[in-house]
């Protein structure tokens, strides 16, 4: 099954997550199909916390992709901010 989920990056104690579309059988940080955004939980000051390509997310969800719980919340937050 194709899922939209977080892939961890960044440094030790400084997480940075790419929001990716990947096959659920692949490793968390492994091969992915498409990168649709990022999430920076440690953003300071004017740094961007969340960027998401909502058009591509909508495309994947309508084509049957599932989302992780955290990504579903981030999508909801991004839609709220865009409106």
Curated annotation (Swiss-Prot):
One of its GO terms (biological process) is translation. The keyword Methyltransferase does not apply. PROSITE patterns: RIBOSOMAL_S16. InterPro entries: Ribosomal_bS16, Ribosomal_bS16_CS, Ribosomal_bS16_dom_sf. Disulfide bonds: none annotated. PANTHER family: 30S RIBOSOMAL PROTEIN S16, SMALL RIBOSOMAL SUBUNIT PROTEIN BS16M. Keywords: Ribonucleoprotein, Ribosomal protein. This is Small ribosomal subunit protein bS16. It holds the Pfam family Ribosomal_S16. Gene3D superfamilies: 3.30.1320.10. It comes from the Bacteria. GO terms for cellular component: cytoplasm; small ribosomal subunit. GO terms for molecular function: structural constituent of ribosome. Belongs to the bacterial ribosomal protein bS16 family.
């Amino acid at each position: 099954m194709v899922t939209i989920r977080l892939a961890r990056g960044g440094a030790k104690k400084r997480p940075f997550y790419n929001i990716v579309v990947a096959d659920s059988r692949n490793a968390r940080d492994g091969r992915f199909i498409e990168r649709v955004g990022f999430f920076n939980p440690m953003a300071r000051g004017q740094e961007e916390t969340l960027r998401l390509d909502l058009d591509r997310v909508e495309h994947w969800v309508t084509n049957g992709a599932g989302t992780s719980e955290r990504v579903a919340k981030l999508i909801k937050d991004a839609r709220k901010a865009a409106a």
